[in-house]
Design a protein with these regions (language model features):
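A residue-level structural signature of the nucleotidyltransferase/glycosyltransferase Rossmann-like core
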Residues: 16-18, 44, 122
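Short connector loops at helix/strand junctions that flank enzyme active sites
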Residues: 18-21, 42, 98-102
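Short, acidic/hydrophobic/Gly-rich beta-strand patch recurrent on exposed beta strands
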Residues: 36-39
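Charged phosphate-binding loop/patch that engages nucleotide di/tri-phosphates or the phosphate backbone
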Residues: 137-177
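Unchanged
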Residues: 52-142, 175-177
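A short gly/proline-enriched turn/hairpin at secondary-structure junctions
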Residues: 46-49
Length: 177
């Protein structure tokens, strides 16, 4: 059954770019935030992402991408916390690239299973390492947008930790950026 339109993102952004969804997968280990990235078919690192399934909400679609591409299961926020622009090769056209707008949803990973897409090499990185990997083989404007998503995700994780567990844990997390 199709979800109500109000729960879905538009198929095109205000600038006319096609819209996809990404799961910004994270975990906290030893007071440090880590992000789970996967390889694209073009060999770049990225967050698990893909099209919005017409039978799922945008956040459910992002969670599905996390499971399929990275084998990540967990709790996903229902509302995206940011967006960024990236490029994608046109299907079947090796040399044709188009811009896409990606809505980012924060997903706290609770469990890892074998990903359906076994060639994606899901790997955990610190925030700085994630920003460095995400910048590889990308033009600065795309790398900067991804770096802002990582920073915003860290800020959200710290804010959530503060509201749930008090200032002590939050200050330890902020030191481990």
């Amino acid at each position: 059954m199709r979800k109500p339109f109000s729960q879905a993102l538009p198929q095109a952004s205000a600038s006319g770019l096609p819209v996809q969804v990404a799961a910004v997968c994270f975990r906290v280990r030893e007071a440090a935030v880590e992000f789970l990235l996967v390889n694209t078919t073009a060999g770049k690192w990225t967050f698990p992402k893909g099209r919005i399934d017409p039978d799922l909400s945008a956040s459910e679609s992002a969670a599905r991408e996390a499971l399929e591409e990275a084998g990540a299961k967990g709790r996903i926020e229902k509302v995206h916390f940011g967006s960024y622009t990236d490029t994608k090769r046109a299907f079947g056209h090796e040399n044709r690239v188009r811009e896409i707008s990606i809505a980012a949803f924060l997903l706290e990973v609770a469990d890892m299973v074998h990903p359906q897409e076994g060639d994606r090499n899901p790997t955990w990185f610190t925030p700085l390492e994630a920003q460095e990997r995400l910048a590889e083989r990308r033009a600065p404007k795309y790398a900067d947008g991804l770096a802002r998503i990582v920073d915003a995700a860290v800020d959200r994780v710290i804010a959530a930790s503060l509201s749930q567990n008090g200032a002590a844990r939050s200050s330890r997390l902020s030191l481990q950026r």
